[in-house]
């Protein structure tokens, strides 16, 4: 079929908005003033004529020596290593797919979700689909929402998208990650909504948290800490892995409840520093790690 230049440009724009600007199909429909089903058809058409090319990798194969070394060195239950792609963005998409496979393998009943790049991509991949045969009953956030516009830093939004796809019950926090004062934080903690999330935190089977370095402070206005080199699930750690106390104004799962969780997977993106990953691993905060192969290689080389 021969396509007019205008149609090719329109298909390319839809593909760009969806795959590169992280827009949902609903958001694209609003931008272009068309129906959401039409956006879906246009994305399929863009793939069929070669505007979009997607490569599929095995979701269960990781470079075994690296995975084993990570587990042996840091006492992990699993070290999930994803081969690097041609760009960080494509690598992060592959990591998001592997994260979804990991969640499926665990079959948890209660899941806690943080925020970040890979978690946001995983939530997006679930948009508009139904995931079969999952044991998940409830999904809740691990920490409050960032005040930036980017959806990848809004844990309540991730909870909504995961819950819709899995047929699970969402429990929202409806609170910022960092409140203006201790009085504001206490006000949130007294609400019925906060107590409903606490009830789920006590029953967590799986916690999904991204690992961040100091760049998270610039991106989200997150409350940084002196001597902290790594952050995960609302907690900061120094280079030796010592947990640092955050102000009482930070809205996140209490540490004692987090440590009672059966599995805690820490996700290290391609642009997160090795020092941040090391600090979280040394703290013993996570039971599993998901990382790009290049990051895992650097980490192993520093510990040998």
Give the residues covered by each predicted segment:
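HTH-adjacent hinge/linker in prokaryotic transcriptional regulators
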Residues: 2-5, 41-112, 123-135, 147-154
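Glycine-rich beta-strand-to-loop/alpha-helix junction loops that act as flexible
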Residues: 83, 112-118, 269, 293
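A general structural motif
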Residues: 106-110, 134-136, 204, 261, ...
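General small-molecule cofactor/ligand-binding pocket signal
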Residues: 79-80, 140, 171
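Conserved phosphate- and dinucleotide-binding cores of soluble alpha/beta proteins
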Residues: 2-15, 20-33, 38-44, 50-57, ...
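Catalytic or ion-translocation cores adjacent to nucleophile or general acid/base/metal-coordination motifs
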Residues: 138-145
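Short Gly/Thr/Asp-enriched flexible loops that form oxyanion-binding sites at enzyme active sites
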Residues: 118-132, 217-228
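N-terminal glycine-rich phosphate/adenylate-binding segment common to multiple enzyme folds
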Residues: 26, 94-111, 117-119, 202-219
């Amino acid at each position: 079929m021969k396509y007019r230049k205008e149609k090719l440009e329109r298909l390319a724009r839809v593909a760009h908005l969806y795959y590169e600007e992280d827009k949902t199909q609903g958001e694209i429909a609003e931008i272009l003033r068309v129906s959401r089903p039409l956006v879906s058809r246009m994305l399929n058409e863009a793939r069929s004529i070669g505007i979009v090319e997607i490569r599929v990798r095995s979701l269960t194969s990781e470079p075994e020596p690296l995975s084993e070394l990570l587990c042996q060195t840091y006492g992990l239950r699993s070290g999930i290593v994803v081969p690097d792609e041609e760009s960080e963005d494509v690598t992060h998409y592959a990591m998001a797919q592997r994260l979804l496979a990991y969640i499926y393998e665990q079959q948890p009943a209660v899941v806690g979700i943080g925020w970040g790049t890979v978690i946001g991509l995983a939530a997006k991949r679930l948009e508009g689909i139904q995931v079969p045969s999952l044991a998940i009953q409830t999904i809740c956030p691990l920490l409050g929402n960032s005040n930036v516009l980017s959806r990848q830093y809004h844990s309540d939004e991730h909870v909504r998208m995961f819950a819709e796809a899995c047929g699970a019950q969402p429990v929202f926090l409806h609170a910022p990650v960092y409140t203006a004062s201790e009085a504001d934080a206490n006000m949130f903690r007294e609400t019925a909504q906060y107590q409903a999330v606490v009830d789920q935190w006590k029953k967590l089977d799986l916690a999904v948290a991204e690992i961040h370095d100091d760049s998270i402070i610039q991106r989200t206005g997150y409350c940084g800490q002196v001597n902290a080199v790594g952050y995960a699930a609302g907690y900061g750690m120094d280079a030796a892995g010592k947990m640092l106390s955050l102000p009482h104004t930070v809205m996140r799962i209490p540490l004692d409840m987090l440590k009672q969780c059966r599995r805690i997977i820490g996700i290290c993106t391609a642009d997160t520093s090795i020092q941040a990953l090391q600090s979280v691993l040394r703290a013993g905060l996570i039971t599993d790690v998901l990382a790009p192969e290049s990051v895992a290689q650097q980490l192993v080389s520093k510990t040998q």
